[in-house]
Amino acid sequence: MDLLYYMTVSLLGFILSLTTFIGETTRALSDDVSSPCKASGFLGDIALTEDDYEREMIRARHNREQYRRRILQERQTRTTGARHHIKKRTIEEAKVRHVRAVTARPERRWTDAVIPYEIDGNFTGSQRAMFKQAMRHWENYTCITFVERNPANSEHDNHIVFTYQACGCCSFVGRKGDGAQAVSVGKNCDKFGVVVHELGHVVGFWHEHTRPDRNEFVGIVHQNIVPGQEYNFRVLDAAEVDSLGETYDFASIMHYARNTFSRGIWLDTILPRKDPESGIRPEIGQRKHLSEGDIIQANLLYKCPSCGRTLLESTGNFSSPEWPGQYDGDQTCVWRISVTPGETISLQFTGFELVGSDGCWYNYLEVRDGHWRHSPLLGRFCGASLPDPILSSDSRLWIELKSSAHRYSRGFAANYEAICGGHIERESGTLQSPNYPDDYHPSKECVWLITMPANYTVGLSFQSFEIERHETCIYDYVEVRDGHEDTSPLIGRYCGYFIPDDIKSTGNKMMVTFVSDGSVNKGGFSADFFKEKDECAQPDQGGCMDVCVNTIGSYRCDCRPGYELSSDGRRCEVAAEVYSLVYEGISPALLIPSPIRGTRTVSGRSSHHLTTGSHSSLSPLTSRVTRCASTTTLMSVAV
């Protein structure tokens, strides 16, 4: 079929996709969260911003004439015999065009490669754990850092929210910059590789097959594409992508599979061109892990230091380049240590030799108590003296080695260890088993002593729970006590796979202990702790006008029988009862306010029967006042 037909259908499908999206959101988002389902348009699972939409519409109109010219040129080529020359352009020859499918717009990149995140409460514990594993996968190979959003931190105003929307798997590309932006993980999308792919869009990646030079590496089989989905195979404009010196990556986790949007599972929509040497078509569309090209590209996009890395294990060691030999001057190395929330980090130096200077100005090692360069400074070191051991206040440390040109030193060597447990004096936070969300380590014992401000109690809510099962929990377990002593009252000992009920202390202290033996290891647990107060014990009962019911982390207002809660959630109003007229198999419902004093009149034929909301049948109606057998309410019935 004529290529013009496919170009036209593709253009129409793309325009339609930009103007409509059918479906209702599964998870309601607040107005200040940008939902990808309400985007101006879509390219596959990519949600387009209004700016993206305008750019694509302008480009679509501009390229329509170019499509026609290209067709004419190809026809002329066939008649002149030059078509054979075009076909002989190999992949190797095309490598001179280095364009990568990542955002070219600096404002779309996350500041200092830090991406704050939230996870909606509608996800299960195993899903939340998998999201964290996907984020750790990106952290493990790049300088990108995912941190749980702190609403009090203005640096976290721009953040992502994992949610479940009607668009299924979809996300914006890069940072929108106007507050919260949703990452939809819909039905059948909650798989590790798919989430890593969606996070690729968050980082700033477009789909690999949309690069401007893609036609040199893959062919699009238009006739096999589902009608209306042709726009997903458009080539991006060079203004949207950055030329970072990387060639086409068939192995990218951002690449479509051969049958994506295909009319049939065995029909190709994208066909990789054969390797000129082996004659084999490369595999595409993997959803297992970041490719080497993905890793290189992300580090180039965020200008990650070439020296250093992110350390995610519970224990480890690291050193300056070439240790114990001298490393070259004029280097910047950054190490990011991240352990399980609820743990702290013990850092010890085993060797240290840097060129000294006043204030350690030229060559230094800096250690910061947090996830980035703006975290509180724990120390700046130089010279030949071994620094004292360092203990973090939380689960992250940031270490930077800076050396000036023409100054050579041996550098340093250090090891670290995650310390689980400890004293916690915060109003809220998270406790997790060591190595969570991966399996916990054997032979571990962690004791957390939580203290809240006076006049508050401690609330504990488990989000996920998978501990080796035993009838009496003698092997691996989580134990909670109402106080800080081993002799404090036992609230419960938990193991197995069922999430324990919410827990609260009677005072402002709680002890949480995790124990694992040397054999079976499971996924562990994640629990949120927070300050808890009995609002119902306050003089105003939390504002409730009738009944106050205290719950973990909150409270609710309720009403006595015969009353119902008003729209403000605090006051009670006289309840309405439903009465039914039952006749000839038909039950029309009448909503009649329940009288406290006085009467209500219901009219009907003598053959009708009257029942209350409890469906207790009365005698045939007569002209008299009747007391209902199932209620004390007086009703006047007239015939």
Curated annotation (Swiss-Prot):
* Span of domain Peptidase M12A: 100-305
Cofactor(s) demanded: Zn(2+)
In terms of PROSITE patterns, this protein maps to: ASTACIN (PS51864), ASX_HYDROXYL (PS00010), CUB (PS01180), EGF_2 (PS01186), EGF_3 (PS50026), EGF_CA (PS01187), ZINC_PROTEASE (PS00142)
What tissues harbor this protein? Ectodermal and primary mesenchyme cells in hatched blastula.
Would you indicate the residue range of the signal peptide? Answer: 1-23
Propiece span(s): 24-109
Protease in keyword set: yes
**GO MF terms held by the record:** calcium ion binding; metalloendopeptidase activity; zinc ion binding
Known InterPro entries for this protein? Answer: BMP_1/tolloid-like, CUB_dom, EGF-like_Ca-bd_dom, EGF-like_dom, EGF-type_Asp/Asn_hydroxyl_site, EGF_Ca-bd_CS, MetalloPept_cat_dom_sf, Peptidase_M12A
Q: Which Gene3D superfamilies match?
A: Collagenase (Catalytic Domain), Laminin, Spermadhesin, CUB domain
Q: Quick one: which residues bind Zn(2+)? A: 197, 201, 207
Its protein name is: Bone morphogenetic protein 1 homolog
Specify the species.
Answer: Strongylocentrotus purpuratus
Q: What is the lineage of its organism?
A: Eukaryota, Metazoa, Echinodermata, Eleutherozoa, Echinozoa
